[in-house]
């Protein structure tokens, strides 16, 4: 028989070919050449000196220590990937192309990124040879800047939201303003069934409910029963897990075969009780549906997505953090979607280089927005495929992909020249590579996130001020603690259209920058004041 102690059970698991048994001499890893019967302790027998023996006491003998070392080494090897932190200096991309490294090292002096990098290297060398010279040349303004008053619209909306329970009707209010009011009521937890009925009365074409966690199943059913759904083009029912099981959505959509003939956009983000069964009903009732958001719908599987792709001509698909969806299973269906323009697969553990390469080859030319944040298997090879096949890309989210290196920015700069939104949060890019990208292809950027990129420093500040000054409106430099007051002031004063600057975690920033910059339009979030109030103001 086999020993049932914890060590031996683990030993048999990692070394299944070992035929160790407690009754066979010369084979047990920690009993040496003696069998258990000779040693005693398994059935109350005595040991060599007549004392009762416990087999576990032998685990501390030197005879089995080499086996313990092998076991611990195997356990450490299996668990290491969960704790690994990749470093640019030592990481090598494991790619199928044997000529990858040779291609990556080729000097392309005529390409935008390489030309910008050469300029930056000269600037760095000059700085090293002239340490006393001014890096940026920014000096704080001596003029006292007037405190900017909040927009009147924001004050009115927040006052209305504060007294939301007193709202009697939303009639006569323009639709866009009505949607803002309802969104603010949802985010401030002031929404109720009476306001919902008021909101849905009339011939509205859009429903924006960013948080339905307050509602019950009956409230949602009753609201849609009294609503005219014939002209609805957009329905947003986010965070509706509590009130949106299958039968409720089936009741709403199954009134007739084409009960939502005009519906184009449907968002059910966070509806964690929905299953694949309801997706066929949605596809039948809304034949014109082009965009669907199923993010965080944890019960949706690959079969449901394949069914949607076959029945609808989708252009936008959001399947963030859907644990039961294997993207490699739905890849053929996605490749057949010729008009796919927006894809979000953030947090999908099965997204890999092969998936991105094949999909970009099939759909890259039409792709406008791509979100692959937290897809930890992606390497620079995926970014190379994006840069080579997506010339019309407008939004790219590469947050928290710690296997990317500076070459990724080279491929983006040379291939995607018209991006308006780029999110690079918590990556390992160097200061010089980010600066080269921004100088080469940052002119069209409206929103840029460099949150928690440790190496961001003066070269990036110069590139933002020179390369992004014409369009940049939203900039996130939170936790970039190498940026000085001088660097931040240089950015803010040169980017005249900058309206939001996020500086969470930037403890190095002083009053010299806060009171010394000359941009009266910028709103600095994360340093002082009420963070929630400032974030709400930025939405208005």
Listing of model-derived features with the role each one plays in the protein:
Residues 186-293, 302, 316, 328, ...:
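Leucine-rich repeat
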